[in-house]
């Protein structure tokens, strides 16, 4: 809802002129906008903005519509683009009697616009049109424009994310704070998974096996049936869709990461966890060489505060100290009886503090395989053979404010239990752990360099 002070501003200030351009898209983003309630769509276009051009909604058509577009070029306006652009093979989209390509019209409008907003995943990153093999060579508009573009991804984005981003510029005359992908931080700055109403079940290792099972109906996590929430940055659980009616995960289907780059190829079209057995594309993570952590990276770990308990029996006991953790350990025990029995047989209850990076990998290997890690290269090979690009998040805690950097990994072992119960395989766990170490060591290295 727009605050009273902002509403007063919109009442007395000249209305911001808005041009809404359609390129390679399905009009789903416009559909999302039409379902706004506070403000309603009619309030939005009559009281807050002056909608100068929108091919689906405007009364004018044909040459009259083209005349309106030419006229608006002489005035101040902001540009919202729905849909990707075919900038190479431009014949994939031609518009109007003059046969202009979508790319030509986009360039013409972008050159005059005070601000440019890519509304939806198609205009932000190319979207479904850019899915393999991408015959139209569609891409996001920022790839072909020299001007700054604010990305509002989603297939579609919520009405709130669209309206609030446009309204911010109309109110303040500047763009909102953006992340490294030029997305508004207020909307895309947090992981969707962390706001999900099903997260407690995720933390407990309670997963739906099928969409129609009792667990799913009772709020179980949908990770095992393909939810990609842990890899997605969006505020869907908070703002929802259709005037805050609901959102996909609450309605019973997993997130498909529709606001992420290349979502259709990398996330969206399979309802399984990202385990190698479900991969439909062959990918070798070439950056994970045999020397991945053998030299400089391990030296950095040796120079910082890095210590953890390495007795797995005690690790499991610590995880089980709270209600969610106790459920998680119990579910791990049920799903991996052999592994749990191996731990019970081979570990006592004496503390075993360790600073050894390889010991962390060995613990993780035991949790996955129920056996000791005989060759440390087996872990690296598994990570290299992971057939997906995206690591599953591990909650390492890096404190850069201490006398020397401190990397706390003590609570992260539970993530291995969670992912195993959720259907992730050894390759996925191995890759995710190594990427977590790599990312944190990179932060430490950058601090040392500065």
Task: Name what the model sees in each region.
Residues 116, 299, 449-450:
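Short glycine-rich phosphate-binding loop at a beta-alpha junction
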Residues 288-289, 322-448:
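A contiguous, well-structured pocket-lining segment that forms one wall/lid of small-molecule binding clefts
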Residues 2, 263-266, 368-375:
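Short helix-capping/linker segments at secondary-structure and domain boundaries
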Residues 305-318:
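Catalytic cores of nucleotide-enabled group-transfer and carboxylate-activating enzymes in metabolic
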Residues 286, 290-303:
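Gly/Thr-rich phosphate-binding beta-strand-loop-beta motif of the actin/hexokinase/Hsp70
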Residues 241-287:
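Extended hydrophobic packing segments that form well-structured cores
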Residues 1-236, 248, 264-269:
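Iron-sulfur-associated redox domains of electron-transfer enzymes in respiratory
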Residues 160-164, 310, 359-362:
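Residues on a specific face of well-ordered alpha-helices
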């Amino acid at each position: 809802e727009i605050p009273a002070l902002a509403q007063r501003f919109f009442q007395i200030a000249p209305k911001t002129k808005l041009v809404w351009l359609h390129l390679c898209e399905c009009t789903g983003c416009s559909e999302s906008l039409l379902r706004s309630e506070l403000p309603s769509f009619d309030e939005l276009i009559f009281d807050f903005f002056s909608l100068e051009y929108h091919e689906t909604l405007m009364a004018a058509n044909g040459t009259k519509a083209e005349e309106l577009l030419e006229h608006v070029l002489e005035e101040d306006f902001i540009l919202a683009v729905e849909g990707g652009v075919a900038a190479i093979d431009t014949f994939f989209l031609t518009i109007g009697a003059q046969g202009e390509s979508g790319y030509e019209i986009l360039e013409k409008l972008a050159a005059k616009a005070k601000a440019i907003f890519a509304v939806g995943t198609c205009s932000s990153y190319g979207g479904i049109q850019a899915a393999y093999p991408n015959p139209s060579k569609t891409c996001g508009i920022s790839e072909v424009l020299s001007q700054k573009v604010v990305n509002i991804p989603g297939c579609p984005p919520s009405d709130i994310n669209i309206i609030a981003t446009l309204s911010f510029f109309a109110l303040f005359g500047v763009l909102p704070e953006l992340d490294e992908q030029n997305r508004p931080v207020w909307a895309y700055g947090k992981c969707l998974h962390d706001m999900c109403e099903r997260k407690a079940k995720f933390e407990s290792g309670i997963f739906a096996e099928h969409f129609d099972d009792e667990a799913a109906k009772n709020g179980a996590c949908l990770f095992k049936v393909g939810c990609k929430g842990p890899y997605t940055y969006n505020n869907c659980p908070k703002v929802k869709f259709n005037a805050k009616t609901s959102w996909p995960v609450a309605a019973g289907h997993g997130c498909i990461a529709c606001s992420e780059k290349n979502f259709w190829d990398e996330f969206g079209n399979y309802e399984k966890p990202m385990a190698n057995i479900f991969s439909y594309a062959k990918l070798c993570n070439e950056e994970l060489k045999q020397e991945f952590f053998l030299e400089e990276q391990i030296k950095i770990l040796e120079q910082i505060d890095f210590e953890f308990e390495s007795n797995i029996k005690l690790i499991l006991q610590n995880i089980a100290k709270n209600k969610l953790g106790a459920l998680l350990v119990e579910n791990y025990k049920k799903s991996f009886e052999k592994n749990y029995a191996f731990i019970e047989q081979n570990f006592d209850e004496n503390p075993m503090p360790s600073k050894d990076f390889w010991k962390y990998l060995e613990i993780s290997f035991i949790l996955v395989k129920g056996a000791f890690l005989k060759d440390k290269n087996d872990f690296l090979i598994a990570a290299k053979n992971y057939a997906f690009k995206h690591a599953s998040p591990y909650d390492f805690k890096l404190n850069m404010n201490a006398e020397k950097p401190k990397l706390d990994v003590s609570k992260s072992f539970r993530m291995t239990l969670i992912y195993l119960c959720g259907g992730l395989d050894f390759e996925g766990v191995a890759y995710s752990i190594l990427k977590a170490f790599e990312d944190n060591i990179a932060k430490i290295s950058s601090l040392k360099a500065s």
